[in-house]
Each structure stands twice: as structure tokens, then as C-alpha cells.
Swiss-Prot record:
Binding partners and assembly: Homotrimer.
Entry binding sites for ATP: 121, 168
Name recorded for this polypeptide: Hydroxyethylthiazole kinase
Reaction(s) catalysed (UniProt annotation): 5-(2-hydroxyethyl)-4-methylthiazole + ATP = 4-methyl-5-(2-phosphooxyethyl)-thiazole + ADP + H(+)
One Gene Ontology term from the biological process aspect of the record: thiamine diphosphate biosynthetic process
Length: 272
């Protein structure tokens, strides 16, 4: 996977406008929907247990986000996930705040046990706590980077869960059971916008809907999103996170194949 291939995935999302079913948290629903629309995908947010299975089976991808979870929402996620699995729809999990409370951590693990996942996207602490590495710092749902080798963590998590792991942060690390890539795009202002990471997970879903290899889809999605964020930060350099948030939506709509080819920094890591 290189910048040129990532750029072509972006074009495929816009060409096919995949339906992304996001069972997400109530803090970020509007921002996520608008971000997917800006990108060129088609969002739907359906939460009721009575309809999630029917919605998931017609979607291009299903995204599960535990940011504001409840027993009922986790049940709905598992119902939707099983339906997606039955119909060949890729499922992406965002274990928001895993490690903050036992209920949150166990909810993420319950979903992983019950649903076959194409990818999991989170920060290092969320991924570490989801797979049982406990010596990482976390505060609420804003997880700290903790300590340790993030590349090794991504490898171990991918092998343990047999899925693509995307750990996002200052440097993004994407791994499957055999390969590891690092990505070097994005901007620090993303950490000042509530829901920027949650939107990114749904963007990964949109790319998984058009690219059958979830590793490549995650790389292309996170690279394209990171480039859009850099361009948005340039445009709002003398302003604050409010202006950046709006400009990020603008740039998700206008970022081009050429932008991604020029700006995306994708490196394959040699692992032993």
C-alpha cells in the first residue's frame, strides 16, 4: 500500500458512496454523519434492536462505537454485528475509553467475542486495555498514550484478535497478522475536536466498504483523513479548533487524489 493506492481508494469511496451504518455515541452523531457526507459516503444511524439487523445487512460497512454505551446499546451492536457477519458486511469497532471502567472494557471484549471484526481503531491505551495489556495510562474516555512499544502492541493485538488494528496518535500504526505500517499525517488540532477519532473510525468503515483488504482500507482511510486534517490546519492557522472543525469537513469534501499522493506518508515497517 502506497500513497497512490490510498488516493485511488478515496476516489472509490466517492464513486460508490457506500452506506455506512454507524451505531455510535450521542456526543458525535451529527459530526460523524456530516463528515461521512462530506467525504462522499452515505451515513445511517440506526440503534433500535428491532431494526439493526435489517439495516446492517444492507450496509456497505457497520461501525460500532462504545462511547456512550449501555447494556441495551451493546446488545444492539452484537445483533447488528452478527447480521453483518452473515451478509459479508465488514464490521469496524471503536472501543472508546476501554480501560476507564470494567463495564466499558468488558463491553468491548464482549463485542469482540461475539462479532467477527474487519478492523479495530483506537488509541494505544484503548487497544492495550481491550487486549489485556494493563500498564497503560487512561483518563475517562480520553486515553493516554501510556508507555511501551506501540508497533509491538499493534502486532500483538492483531495476532491475538486476528483482525486489523489501527492505533492512531502522533504516529499512526496499522497492523494485521503479517504486516505493519506507520502513517505520519494528521494534526494536533484533531485532539481539540470532540469526535474527531470517532468520525475517523466511520471513515475507516467507508473505505472498508470499497476495498476488500481491511489493512489497505484502514491505511487509505487514515492517510486521507490525516491529509485533510493537515490541509484544514493550514487553512485555519491563525484561528482555533472551532474553525478547524468546520474546515476539516470542508477538506474531507475537497481533498483530492493528488493531495493524498503528494502529502500521504506511508511507511512499511520491517518486523521480525
Amino acid at each position: 500500500m502506497d500513497a497512490q493506492s490510498a488516493a485511488k481508494c478515496l476516489t472509490a469511496v466517492r464513486r460508490h458512496s457506500p452506506l455506512v451504518h454507524s451505531i455510535t455515541n450521542n456526543v458525535v452523531t451529527n459530526f460523524t454523519a456530516n463528515g461521512l457526507l462530506a467525504l462522499g459516503a452515505s451515513p445511517v444511524m440506526a440503534y433500535a434492536k428491532e431494526e439493526v439487523a435489517d439495516m446492517a445487512k444492507i450496509a456497505g460497512a457497520l461501525v460500532l462505537n462504545i462511547g456512550t454505551l449501555s447494556k441495551e446499546s451493546v446488545e444492539a451492536m452484537i445483533i447488528a454485528g452478527k447480521s453483518a457477519n452473515e451478509h459479508g458486511v465488514p464490521v469496524i469497532l471503536d472501543p472508546v475509553g476501554a480501560g476507564a471502567t470494567p463495564f466499558r472494557t468488558e463491553s468491548a471484549r464482549d463485542i469482540i467475542r461475539e462479532v467477527r471484526l474487519a478492523a479495530i481503531r483506537g488509541n494505544a491505551a484503548e487497544i492495550a486495555h481491550t487486549v489485556g495489556v494493563t500498564d497503560w495510562l487512561i483518563k475517562g474516555v480520553d486515553a493516554g498514550e501510556g508507555g511501551g512499544d506501540i508497533i509491538r502492541l499493534a502486532q500483538q493485538a492483531a495476532q491475538k484478535l486476528n483482525t486489523v488494528i489501527a492505533i492512531t496518535g502522533e504516529v499512526d500504526v496499522i497492523a494485521d497478522t503479517s504486516h505493519v505500517y506507520t502513517l505520519h499525517n494528521g494534526h494536533k488540532l484533531l485532539t481539540k475536536v470532540t469526535g474527531a477519532g470517532c468520525l475517523l473510525t466511520s471513515v475507516v468503515g467507508a473505505f472498508c466498504a470499497v476495498e476488500e483488504n481491511p489493512l489497505f482500507a484502514a491505511i487509505a482511510a487514515i492517510s486521507s483523513y490525516g491529509v485533510a486534517a493537515q490541509l484544514a490546519a493550514q487553512q485555519t492557522a491563525d484561528k482555533g479548533p472551532g474553525s478547524f472543525q468546520i474546515e476539516l469537513l470542508n477538506k474531507l469534501s475537497t481533498v483530492t487524489e493528488q493531495d493524498v499522493q503528494e502529502w500521504a506518508t506511508i511507511e512499511r515497517v520491517t518486523v521480525s
